[in-house]
Curated annotation (Swiss-Prot):
Part of the 50S ribosomal subunit. The keyword Ribosomal protein applies. This protein binds to the 23S rRNA, and is important in its secondary structure. It is located near the subunit interface in the base of the L7/L12 stalk, and near the tRNA binding site of the peptidyltransferase center. The keyword Cytoplasm does not apply. This is Large ribosomal subunit protein uL6. One of its GO terms (biological process) is cytoplasmic translation. GO terms for molecular function: rRNA binding; structural constituent of ribosome. Keywords: Ribonucleoprotein, Ribosomal protein, RNA-binding, rRNA-binding. InterPro entries: Ribosomal_uL6-like, Ribosomal_uL6-like_a/b-dom_sf, Ribosomal_uL6_a/b-dom, Ribosomal_uL6_bac-type, Ribosomal_uL6_CS. One of its GO terms (cellular component) is cytosolic large ribosomal subunit. Belongs to the universal ribosomal protein uL6 family. Pfam families: Ribosomal_L6.
């Protein structure tokens, strides 16, 4: 059984945290984030740390309080360091380019795929085959990366497509004559 929820989240100097009912708010150098905690979980802010515990001793509440503690820790990391994902593009003629608040992707279709960059997310393209996605909200950074990857997921025969930089693509052998 995991005991992630028992550890308090220590709030460093330079970050302000507040708990009002079920809403946890954190402000830091990278912005402000909020998280609404489930009703089965109780959140307290005292002595410079946020503690999370279940209101009732049910299996559901015990499962949720570990998740809530991890979400609060992600808020803290987001407002201090931020989150970043790197995507690699592999394939002949596959490339990415930024055009203002839009990401243009040439992924082997008859047309270019244009992705509107949401607010709070920063995308940089240092090379035409690399995309860096950064922001202060872990969930939104991961969601944007997953949406871009879904336009052309890597295929197992040649490895062409958009993949996470740390992702391993299991390669298959083609059929033999």
């Amino acid at each position: 059984m995991s005991r992630v929820g028992k550890k308090p989240v220590v709030v460093p100097s330079g970050v302000t945290a507040s708990v009002q009912g079920q809403i946890v708010t954190m402000k830091g150098p990278k912005g402000q984030l909020q998280f609404i905690v489930h009703d089965d979980v109780e959140v307290q802010f005292e002595n410079g740390s946020v503690t999370v515990k279940p209101r009732v001793e049910t299996n559901r509440a015990r499962a949720l309080y570990g998740t809530a503690r991890a979400q609060v820790a992600n808020l803290l990391e987001g407002v201090t360091k931020g989150f970043e994902k790197k995507l690699d593009i592999t394939g002949v003629g596959y490339r990415a380019a930024l055009q203002g608040k839009k990401l243009q992707l040439a992924l082997g279709y008859s047309h270019d795929v244009v992705y509107d960059i949401p607010d709070g997310i920063t995308i940089t393209v240092p090379k035409p085959t690399e995309i860096f996605i950064s922001g202060n909200d872990s969930q939104r950074v991961g969601q944007v990366a997953a949406e871009i990857r879904s336009y052309r997921p890597p295929e197992p025969y040649k490895g062409k497509g958009v993949r996470y930089s740390d992702e391993f693509i299991f390669r298959k052998e083609g059929k033999k004559k």
